[in-house]
Amino acid sequence: MKLSRRHFMKANAVAAAAAVAGITIPIAVRAATEQSDAIHWDKAPCRFCGVGCGVLVGTQNGRIVASQGDPEAPVNRGLNCIKGYFLPKIMYGQDRLTQPLLRMRNGQFDKEGEFTPISWDKAFDIMAEKFKTALKEKGPNAIGMFGSGQSTIWEGYASAKLFKAGFRSNNIDPNARHCMASAVVGFMRTFGMDEPMGCYDDIEQTDAFVLWGSNMAEMHPILWSRITDRRLSNSNVTVAVLSTYQHRSFELADNGMVFTPQTDLAILNYIANYIIQNNAVNEAFFTRHVNLRRGVTDIGYGLRPTHPLEKAAKNPGSDASEPMSFEEYKAFVADYTLEKTVAISGVPADQLEALAKLYADPKKKVISYWTMGFNQHTRGVWANNLVYNIHLLTGKISQPGCGPFSLTGQPSACGTAREVGTFAHRLPADMVVTNEKHRAIAEKLWQLPTGTIPEKIGLHAVAQDRALKDGTLNAYWVMCNNNMQAGPNINQERMPGWRDPRNFIVVSDPYPTISALAADLILPTAMWVEKEGAYGNAERRTQFWRQQVKAPGESKSDLWQVVSFAKRFTVEDVWPEELLAQKPAYRGKTLYDVLFANDVTTRFPLSELAENQLNDESREFGFYLQKGLFEEYAAFGRGHGHDLAPFDAYHKVRGLRWPVVDGKETQWRYSEGHDPYVKAGEAYRFYGKPDGKAVIFALPYEPAAEAPDEEYDLWFSTGRVLEHWHTGSMTRRVPELHRAFPEAVLFIHPQDAKARDLRRGEKVRIISRRGEVISVVETRGRNKPPRGLVYMPFFDAAQMTNVLTLDATDPLSKETDFKKCAVKLAKV
């Protein structure tokens, strides 16, 4: 539908509108509208990045017609970025999928057939047949799911429960493996608990911002607006930016540094050395709250075991470490002198020293921010550990304005992938499948027979690709992501497995993405406020929203899909007799009965829904499904530092930062006076560790898996741009965003282009050892690579950037390094 100019102006001029439970409206903007055509407003977190901005969603006649920044939201305070302004339009692309589609020929499934509309019953029939066949012939390791940091909390929870408890397979992993896994392992190694200790309120209280591999100006623009305000309104505030190329965040930088890829490890160790050599260690903090350990080195690059680099590694995949003394640590970092670090990194000495002084100054509060530059790194866990070292040496942590802060890229990479535990090795609340006690807790809360959850870690994202290609993973469900475009090494390691006749691939998506078109079965999915949902953002803020419109056609939420699919399996289909013998009352029941319609999940009746409140899933199943799942999930974390508030509390507020104890959220963890888990007199307690102490790790600089050589003479890096989000499957369907940045380009230094007789605007072939892509030369614009490096975003489905990238991963986190491989260029 089209809005009249009068309605458009009314919808966008007000700071907030409509009296909805939990939303307060400033008196000045409570303008009455005609009841017959009034826009109804309700709150929701933004659908895009991990900042977690609050928006007001305006609906009219069953459609979303407007959105605006929520002035009551503490994250964004009424602001939106350019993507947030166009949220309504992501819902209504002309090619929106509205019914299941199966590859068919002559009325039957055929992997080489054409996509044909079918019913949900038929879709689940063939899906169940393929999953049951794989389970019967090869067991739980033959099935898998690739989920998302964009799934709602209960969608992720239901998926993990279905696979780990129902199918007894840990082969479920989220696309957050590609972006946040190194941060997770880094947090766990250093602190014993995941996620940042600080919050966004640090921005207004700090003296210095240091960005490590993070272009916040484009990737986290609302937070960047707050940083900009802090910097420009306070002359004593400093901004330092480190990256492998110049980008828009450099425009605000007092100290902008471009370093050679992978050498951030050396810079981090140099800063630690500078702190020690200049007597800037916070002795009182360090002595009481820190342990030291030496990590194993030469750990490989997460490639296939047959790869020469893996064969050559002395300790492939090892996360082992041993205690060390301060004197030993001092000697270790002493090797990273200013002169050596300049030689390795290419950063001028005066800039490195200025950065080190910033951290060492006891009068300066410092925040370190990072995203994919650290995490998508073959030593990403080490990079995370090393930046924690700096904050632990100086005691600049867990206090207002001070701390290390890992930013997230997806709206619920924290709340769903990490906190719920949709990784192949995790359970809710930082528990892991390899820990017998953790499995026992999960089995008790889920009312499962002892031994149901397998102890072996499942296949991570890249391992899933390899298993599909090798024919050992045969039934595969991809949900809420576009991994065929977003994952690495497409032609060699992913596409072959998807099109292998031994495998059956299901993709749940609202649009015909590259992934959907490569699948065998496409399930049309409800988006954003077409369902009730919850996200958890980067500052541990859990935010809820209500369903506000119905999904088009036969589209169904991912939660409905998971729960409904569970009805197709009896416990006898998936559990051995030794498990059934422990729970004879379960015989003959479906996984739906046991996992999703038990006495815990069904305890909240439909009467708890507000009158006329949309909630398609709950009304179909006959109970308040989301509330039942959330309260069951929350039981994992309450009482040991992961406390979530009661379900109903979140509908009344703009989110709460966990742990939430006695109704009060926590802004700064691990410090006395801020964290309810730190007792009086303790000052700090890193209670994720048994002794309450954080760990400083001695870890060296090690080179990248692939670097330029005589033939492939350029570094290649990929990432995002402001206007588009990830693979562009939503933003490229917004005409304004598409026009703003219609196609991917190759950013290159003018002298590198000239040396290859390439001119701006010309087409160019980018060639790696894995494939090639044609793009357009760009020697100007927002991104300015140094000589020897090129940068290309991956949002453009017509230019499959990740054909080029290497599937090397951090051996500890299994996260892919999208930032470093070698390419050469050729004229077209």
UniProtKB/Swiss-Prot annotation:
Predicted to be exported by the Tat system. The position of the signal peptide cleavage has not been experimentally proven. Residues 1-31 form the signal peptide. GO terms for molecular function: 4 iron, 4 sulfur cluster binding; electron transfer activity; iron ion binding; molybdenum ion binding; molybdopterin cofactor binding; nitrate reductase (cytochrome) activity. Substrate binds at F794. One of its GO terms (biological process) is nitrate assimilation. Mo-bis(molybdopterin guanine dinucleotide) binds at residues 83, 150, 175, 179, 212-219, 243-247, 262-264, 372, 376, 482, 508-509, 531, 558, 718-727, 802, 819. Gene3D superfamilies: 2.40.40.20, 3.30.200.210, 3.40.50.740, Dimethylsulfoxide Reductase, domain 2. It comes from the Bacteria. It is an enzyme of class 1 (oxidoreductase). Its EC number is 1.9.6.1. The keyword Signal applies. Belongs to the prokaryotic molybdopterin-containing oxidoreductase family. NasA/NapA/NarB subfamily. This is Periplasmic nitrate reductase. The lineage of its organism: Bacteria, Pseudomonadati, Pseudomonadota, Gammaproteobacteria, Enterobacterales.
